[in-house]
């Protein structure tokens, strides 16, 4: 184990000097013995000097401190011992529940599976959320992005997905909290505990208050745990909240590492860093990883380089819209902007496909008529258009749904709606079978039967 000494500290970036014939490799983990801090090598500058990123606070470091090379990358425990536990980026427990029992530790830097190991799947993963199952169905082993600005419900929608999938499919999940609020991480832990699904979830947190090195690597730590379950012939769910903060952490250290910034100040290696993470989230012949990633959209601008780079890796995109949230419709999913590769007659069947497209057609027509209604009022519309507007408003309200995880705020018990019921209900609304019901009856209900019951009380 070779030793070196710190020669420069600039925020999270630390230069360490070793003997020239003992220079650490890129991605090796180094230990600052006195401070109990782990550094990860990013660059070899020459003359035995390496540039590293600190995986914790660099407060109190000084030049000349001794640093030991572990001769290995950062490794985290994998397997059943991680279930129900909260870990940090280094795989150390932070839930005060004793040490983690494990038989194997893996490096957080792994090569993606080889081409001949990959497996394709067209199986649909039922989520119980109407708008998702109808408009942007998930593929087992696919990647899903939840796009939205600040405060439109990304984290709540993600918590509902974890809750539903853990209860209905009893699969293992890994949750990587990347640069999100510590309060949300805390709420999430107790939410899982109360729902009795904590023993099926591994939690890896590197929250907002952590230094950038921590946030840059915590997604990889979570992914390594998910890969461990996948290699045990399991179907795993990987949740990342929030993938934008992973990019942002890279941006924070990029300039300090001496790289020229690219568009909007992002790191020039943005696409490569994103690819290194996303290419590992995939299904092999042994098991599958289905991933759901929350993507913060800066200033609601989907063309920003960070969300734009993420888009290219996804199979389905769920776009949360502020305009829909303002109407009080939650989940605030935009049915015209959200897409899925699985929405194909060969995958979901002709009936589902036609219903989804009919719903989108009605909503698109309503969107076009909105300007006319705003200027001239409803009376100037043809009878056919009046019908479309009426149905569109019902569809819009019926796309809302009470969530289990939001029960404490709303007082409405959460609803899980099967895919069969969802398709049949929307087909009936589009065909005009419920034209006689008031639109308020469709708001915040589960199945169409509940809407009929609610209409009797209005």
UniProtKB/Swiss-Prot annotation:
Which EC class, in a word? Answer: translocase
Q: What is its main location?
A: membrane
| Gene3D superfamilies xref list | 2.40.10.170, Bovine Mitochondrial F1-atpase, Atp Synthase Beta Chain, Chain D, domain 3, P-loop containing nucleotide triphosphate hydrolases
Which Gene Ontology cellular component annotation is one that this UniProt entry carries?
proton-transporting ATP synthase complex
- Cross-referenced CDD domains, in alphabetical order? ATP-synt_F1_beta_C (cd18110), ATP-synt_F1_beta_N (cd18115), F1-ATPase_beta_CD (cd01133)
The annotated topology with respect to the bilayer is: Peripheral membrane protein
Domain of life of the organism encoding this protein = Bacteria
Task: Please state the Enzyme Commission number of this protein.
Answer: 7.1.2.2
Q: Where in the cell is it found?
A: Cell inner membrane
Sites where the protein binds ATP = 148-155
Q: Which reaction does it catalyse?
A: ATP + H2O + 4 H(+)(in) = ADP + phosphate + 5 H(+)(out)
Q: Fetch the InterPro entries from UniProt.
A: AAA+_ATPase (IPR003593), ATP-synt_VA_C (IPR055190), ATP_synth_F1_bsu (IPR005722), ATPase_a/bsu_AS (IPR020003), ATPase_alpha/beta_chains (IPR050053), ATPase_F1/V1/A1_a/bsu_N (IPR004100), ATPase_F1/V1/A1_a/bsu_N_sf (IPR036121), ATPase_F1/V1/A1_a/bsu_nucl-bd (IPR000194)
Which GO molecular function, any one, fits this protein according to its record? ATP hydrolysis activity
Q: Which UniProt keywords apply?
A: ATP synthesis, ATP-binding, Cell inner membrane, Cell membrane, CF(1), Hydrogen ion transport, Ion transport, Membrane, Nucleotide-binding, Translocase, Transport
Family the entry assigns: Belongs to the ATPase alpha/beta chains family.
Tell me the subunit arrangement: F-type ATPases have 2 components, CF(1) - the catalytic core - and CF(0) - the membrane proton channel. CF(1) has five subunits: alpha(3), beta(3), gamma(1), delta(1), epsilon(1). CF(0) has three main subunits: a(1), b(2) and c(9-12). The alpha and beta chains form an alternating ring which encloses part of the gamma chain. CF(1) is attached to CF(0) by a central stalk formed by the gamma and epsilon chains, while a peripheral stalk is formed by the delta and b chains.
The protein's role, per its UniProt record = Produces ATP from ADP in the presence of a proton gradient across the membrane. The catalytic sites are hosted primarily by the beta subunits.
- Listed name of the protein: ATP synthase subunit beta
Species of origin reads: Francisella tularensis subsp. tularensis (strain SCHU S4 / Schu 4)
């Amino acid at each position: 184990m070779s030793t070196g000494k710190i020669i420069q500290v600039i925020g999270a970036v630390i230069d360490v000097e070793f003997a020239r014939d003992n220079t650490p490799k890129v991605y090796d983990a180094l230990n600052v013995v006195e401070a109990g801090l782990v550094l990860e090598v990013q660059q070899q500058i020459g003359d035995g000097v390496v540039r590293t990123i600190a995986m914790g606070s660099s407060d109190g470091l000084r030049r000349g401190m001794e640093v030991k090379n572990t001769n290995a990358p950062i490794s985290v425990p994998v397997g059943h011992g991680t279930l129900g536990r909260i870990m940090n980026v280094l795989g150390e427990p932070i839930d005060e529940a004793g040490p983690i029992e494990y038989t194997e530790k893996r490096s957080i830097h792994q090569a993606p599976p080889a081409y001949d190991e990959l497996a394709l799947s067209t199986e649909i993963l039922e989520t119980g959320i109407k708008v998702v199952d109808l408009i942007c169905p998930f593929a087992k082993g696919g990647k899903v992005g939840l796009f939205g600005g600040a405060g439109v419900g990304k984290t709540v929608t993600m918590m509902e997905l974890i809750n539903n999938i853990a209860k209905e499919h009893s699969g293992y999940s890994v949750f990587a909290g990347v640069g999100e609020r510590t309060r949300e991480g805390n709420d999430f832990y107790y939410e899982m505990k109360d729902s009795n699904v904590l023993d099926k979830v591994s939690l890896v947190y590197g929250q907002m208050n952590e230094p950038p090195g921590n946030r840059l690597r915590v997604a990889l730590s979570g992914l390594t745990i998910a890969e461990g379950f996948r290699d045990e012939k399991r179907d795993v769910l990987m949740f990342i909240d929030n993938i934008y903060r992973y990019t942002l952490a890279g941006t924070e250290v990029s300039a300090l590492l001496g790289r020229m910034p690219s568009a909007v100040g992002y790191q020039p290696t943005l696409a490569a860093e994103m690819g290194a993470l996303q290419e590992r989230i995939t299904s092999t012949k042994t098991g599958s990883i289905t991933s759901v990633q929350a993507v913060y959209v800066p200033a609601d601008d989907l063309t920003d380089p960070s969300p734009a780079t993420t888009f290219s890796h996804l199979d389905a995109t769920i776009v949360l819209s502020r305009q829909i949230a303002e109407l009080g419709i939650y989940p605030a999913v935009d049915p015209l902007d959200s897409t899925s590769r699985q929405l194909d007659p060969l995958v979901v069947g002709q009936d589902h496909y036609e219903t989804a497209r009919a719903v989108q057609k009605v909503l698109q027509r309503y969107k076009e008529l909105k300007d006319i209604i705003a200027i001239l009022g409803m009376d100037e519309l043809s009878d056919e258009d009046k019908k479309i507007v009426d149905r569109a408003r019902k569809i819009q309200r019926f796309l809302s749904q009470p969530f289990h995880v939001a029960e404490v705020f709303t007082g409405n018990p959460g609803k899980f709606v099967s895919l069969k019921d969802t398709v049949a209900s929307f087909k009936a609304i589009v065909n005009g079978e419920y034209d006689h019901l008031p639109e308020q009856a469709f708001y915040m209900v589960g199945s169409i039967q509940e809407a009929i019951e609610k209409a009797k009380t209005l």
